[in-house]
UniProtKB/Swiss-Prot annotation:
Ranges where the record places region Disordered: 104-127
DNA-binding region: 18-93
Organism: Mus musculus (Mouse)
Gene name in the database record: Rorb
Name of the protein described by the UniProt record: Nuclear receptor ROR-beta
Lineage per the UniProt record: Eukaryota, Metazoa, Chordata, Craniata, Vertebrata
GO MF, one example: RNA polymerase II cis-regulatory region sequence-specific DNA binding
Length: 470
């Protein structure tokens, strides 16, 4: 499907993939049907031509087509493909002309220069943030006592499992560098609120809670306010709505596309997955920023909670985009199974992640429950180096109260909350395994990690990233 790639004047084949997909802006995989596109847009155009599809736009035929919402309107996506020159006949044209090669080479050079400038800018921002946080982070943390109590369910105290985190930090070690997360600088995912739950009185049926017992100082109205805020924040910061996920459920990667993933080099697929994980984490950061109680924590604790818990929330959210009927997960616009990730060389990590997603799906959680459980996982008082662990604990307890009420409203099974809490060690174990696999990969491909992986990904999961970014 790809036409011959242009030759550079110096060192062989130009890296066309540095140019984003012309249709949606995702990472491209070459020239398809005459246009530089990603695998997703290539497959979409091929299917539209094979089926002679006729699409209609439910809006005004001017939908924005980008990587996040490219699946929302097939009509506008196809029109953009055609407008940019995609054609079935393009594959018959043979070699490109010298003028076309020179033009493409110039565009490659422009994008490479832009990427280099972005890396330099991000490195400078990380260094500046490091100076801002270094004094507040390094002082007074070595004697921190993070021992906390439990939370309530069914009128009893439940001991929550301790989270080991990614860094296995001993009390004698310095606090991890936090330069990679700027709570004021993260790009807004969605600028305007799109869900309004404030008009829904008494979102939960509290009478089901045993004897109506709450911890001292906690009121039902406060629980309701916190829950509505968290659920609203969750709905506004998911990459896909449930309706969109249902529409995509049986759009699976073709055999040819799966083989293409399997034929990728290990480093290429690692980089691809790192980019996807980073994008999901950006939504989690925005989710956290919209939680009222989270933003009331000190900035040090906000950053520490995100650094240690963001991947755990991504793993919980993964169950939304997981199809347990055929064991596939949404990846780059379509569903695929574990075999897609063979080239990673981390079969045990992939198996653990898929097993967890399938087990979590078996609980048939609602969006409300996923929202509250995600926030409870994120806002954990057991993270190392917290300045105010007691304040974090109180907020988590309120979230668990709200989660218990929702579960009692939606499930006949009183053990659902206990089952969720019992999964937290598995979540931590999968995330720790990811960290171990990353370190193994970095040992054999340090330059790939240091130069090509997203800066935010390196800051979160690379213990010695501070040395790289400065």
């Amino acid at each position: 499907m790809c036409e011959n790639q242009p030759k550079t004047k110096a060192d062989g084949t130009a890296q066309i993939e540095v140019i984003p997909c012309k249709i949606c802006g995702d990472k491209s995989s070459g020239i398809h049907y005459g246009v530089i596109t990603c695998e997703g847009c290539k497959g979409f155009f091929r299917r539209s031509q094979q089926n002679n599809a006729s699409y209609s736009c439910p809006r005004q035929r001017n939908c924005l087509i980008d990587r996040t919402n490219r699946n929302r309107c097939q009509h506008c996506r196809l029109q953009k493909c055609l407008a940019l020159g995609m054609s079935r006949d393009a594959v018959k044209f043979g070699r490109m002309s010298k003028k076309q090669r020179d033009s493409l080479y110039a565009e490659v050079q422009k994008h490479q220069q832009r990427l280099q400038e972005q890396r330099q800018q991000q490195s400078g921002e990380a260094e500046a943030l490091a100076r801002v946080y270094s004094s507040s982070i390094s002082n007074g943390l070595s004697n921190l006592n993070t021992e906390t109590g439990g939370t309530y369910a069914n009128g009893h105290v439940i001991d929550l499992p301790k989270s080991e985190g990614y860094y296995s930090i001993d009390s004698g070690q310095p606090s991890p560098d936090q330069s990679g997360l700027d709570m004021t600088g993260i790009k807004q995912i969605k600028q305007e609120p799109i869900y309004d739950l404030t008009s829904v009185p008494n979102l939960f049926t509290y009478s089901s809670f045993n004897n109506g017992q709450l911890a001292p100082g906690i009121t039902m109205s406060e629980i309701d306010r916190i829950a509505q805020n968290i659920i609203k924040s969750h709905l506004e910061t998911c990459q896909y709505t449930m309706e969109e996920l249902h529409q995509l459920a049986w759009q699976t990667h073709t055999y040819e596309e799966i083989k293409a993933y399997q034929s990728k080099s290990r480093e290429a697929l690692w980089q691809q997955c790192a980019i996807q994980i980073t994008h999901a984490i950006q939504y989690v950061v925005e989710f956290a920023k919209r939680i009222t109680g989270f933003m009331e924590l000190c900035q040090n604790d906000q950053i520490l909670l995100l650094k240690s818990g963001c991947l755990e929330v991504v793993l919980v959210r993964m169950c939304r985009a997981f199809n347990p009927l055929n064991n596939t997960v949404l990846f780059e616009g379509k569903y695929g199974g574990m075999q897609m990730f063979k080239a990673l060389g981390s079969d045990d990590l992939v198996n653990e992640a898929f097993d967890f997603a399938k087990n979590l799906c078996s609980l048939q959680l609602t969006e409300e429950e996923i929202a509250l459980f995600s926030s409870a996982v994120l806002i954990s008082p057991d993270r190392a180096w917290l300045i105010e662990p007691r304040k974090v604990q109180k907020l988590q307890e309120k979230i668990y109260f709200a989660l218990q009420h929702v579960i009692q409203k939606n499930h006949l099974d009183d053990e659902t909350l206990a089952k969720l809490i019992a999964k937290i060690p598995t979540i931590t174990a999968v995330c720790n395994l990811h960290g171990e696999k990353l370190q193994v990969f970095k040992q054999s491909h340090p330059d790939i990690v240091n130069t090509l992986f997203p800066p935010l990904y390196k800051e979160l999961f690379n213990p010695d990233c501070a040395a790289v970014c400065k």
